[in-house]
């Protein structure tokens, strides 16, 4: 008989603690081993109970949830899901939670939810099961002098013509994985489009933070943005991102079509459009994440002549999306996270020499 997933619930609201206990008790695979109303009680229970997964509130008495998580990850690393009211959580707090080590951030459940408790329960239980399998200590990006201003390198007019294009898919663990990946790319990075699963309102701050770290431009994509070397475009939350072609140039097309794999943006939309318009001049990468988004799109890119890579299991926080891509035969190579950028650059050199 499989071992149950042992969960510790940390929230100052007795109502939320009871609601989460009710949700978890409906699943035979999950056992609530304890609850805590503040971080100090939670610390003692973490040490005593050694849970597989901790659910954590952000706003709590005596110490906020993010500060507590930072301490937990230093001294007692634990797979953590942050439950927060995303409408109240500022984008900086959201990103800080991910940087501190949260594997997932979910909308805090409430008693007066418009969706049924059954639907809500299914989503939360699915996340807990996936997070229970996650790696706690993925590879971290080494970015020199993160506080120092980064000099941007303008693209030349020649570089603005159509050539190579890079499409990247990432989800759970992806915000940190993207930093590792991008830290290996040069200032004249090929025109790059990224789909990172994030709620609306948070992708802009994420892009702005990345822009401060690297010598190339990183921005949240807008309708009509041109895809050029030296620029990385992040799909905005709640919008699918595709590309279209006009003459020798590629442009961003945003829309709010149906969610795919329960997500919007979905990488499959992007990668299928890249396969259609760019073909063999493209490269595709699927990084860490739950589910299977990007797998079919990466396969279409490969079949169109693009070079494709999936992150290996050992360096993923959650080996879901890359596993799905590998299972379809969509990846030319399966590589550790810190080797993907270098491999793509070698591939570019080979293409340019041909």
UniProtKB/Swiss-Prot annotation:
Residues carrying 4-aspartylphosphate: 57
GO cellular component: cytoplasm
EC number: 3.1.1.61, 3.5.1.44
Main location: cytoplasm
Domain of life: Bacteria
Domain Response regulatory: 6-123
Residues at the catalytic site: 171, 197, 293
Cited CDD domains: CheB_Rec, REC_CheB-like
Keyword Lipid biosynthesis found: no
Keyword tags: Chemotaxis, Cytoplasm, Hydrolase, Phosphoprotein
InterPro entries in UniProt: CheB-like, CheB_C, CheY-like_superfamily, Sig_transdc_resp-reg_Me-estase, Sig_transdc_resp-reg_receiver
Domain commentary: Contains a C-terminal catalytic domain, and an N-terminal region which modulates catalytic activity.
Similarity comment text for this entry: Belongs to the CheB family.
Function recorded in the entry: Involved in chemotaxis. Part of a chemotaxis signal transduction system that modulates chemotaxis in response to various stimuli. Catalyzes the demethylation of specific methylglutamate residues introduced into the chemoreceptors (methyl-accepting chemotaxis proteins or MCP) by CheR. Also mediates the irreversible deamidation of specific glutamine residues to glutamic acid.
Protein name, per record: Protein-glutamate methylesterase/protein-glutamine glutaminase
Species assigned in the record: Bdellovibrio bacteriovorus (strain ATCC 15356 / DSM 50701 / NCIMB 9529 / HD100)
């Amino acid at each position: 008989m499989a071992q149950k997933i042992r969960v510790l619930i940390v929230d100052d609201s007795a109502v939320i603690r009871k609601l989460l206990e009710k949700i978890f008790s409906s699943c035979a695979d999950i056992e609530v081993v304890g609850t805590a109303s503040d971080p100090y009680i939670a610390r003692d229970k973490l040490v005593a109970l050694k849970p597989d997964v901790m659910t954590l509130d952000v706003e709590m008495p005596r110490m906020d949830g993010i500060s507590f998580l930072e301490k937990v990850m230093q001294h007692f690393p634990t797979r953590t899901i942050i439950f927060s009211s995303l409408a109240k959580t500022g984008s900086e707090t959201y990103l800080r939670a991910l940087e501190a080590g949260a594997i997932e951030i979910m909308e805090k459940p409430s008693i007066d939810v418009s969706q049924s408790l059954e639907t809500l329960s299914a989503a939360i239980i699915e996340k807990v099961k996936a997070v229970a399998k996650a790696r706690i200590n993925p590879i971290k990006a080494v970015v020199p002098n993160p506080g120092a201003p980064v000099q941007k390198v303008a693209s030349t007019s020649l570089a603005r013509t159509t050539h190579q294009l890079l499409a990247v898919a990432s989800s759970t663990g992806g915000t940190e994985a993207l930093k590792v990946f991008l830290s290996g790319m040069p200032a004249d990075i090929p025109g790059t489009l990224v789909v990172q699963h994030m709620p609306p309102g948070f992708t802009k701050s994420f892009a702005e933070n990345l822009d401060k770290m690297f010598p190339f431009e990183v921005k949240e994509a807008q309708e009509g943005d041109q895809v050029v070397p030296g620029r990385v475009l992040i799909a905005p939350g709640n919008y699918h991102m595709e590309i279209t072609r006009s003459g020798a140039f590629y442009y961003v097309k945003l829309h709010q079509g149906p969610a795919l794999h329960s997500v919007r943006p979905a990488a499959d939309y992007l990668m299928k459009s890249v396969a259609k318009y760019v073909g063999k001049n493209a490269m595709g990468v699927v990084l860490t994440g739950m589910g299977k988004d990007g797998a079919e799109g990466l396969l279409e890119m490969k079949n169109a002549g693009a070079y494709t890579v999936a992150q290996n299991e050992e360096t993923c926080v959650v080996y879901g999306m890359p596993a799905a891509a590998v299972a379809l035969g969509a990846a030319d190579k399966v590589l550790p996270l810190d080797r993907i950028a270098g491999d793509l650059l070698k591939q570019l050199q080979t293409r340019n020499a041909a």
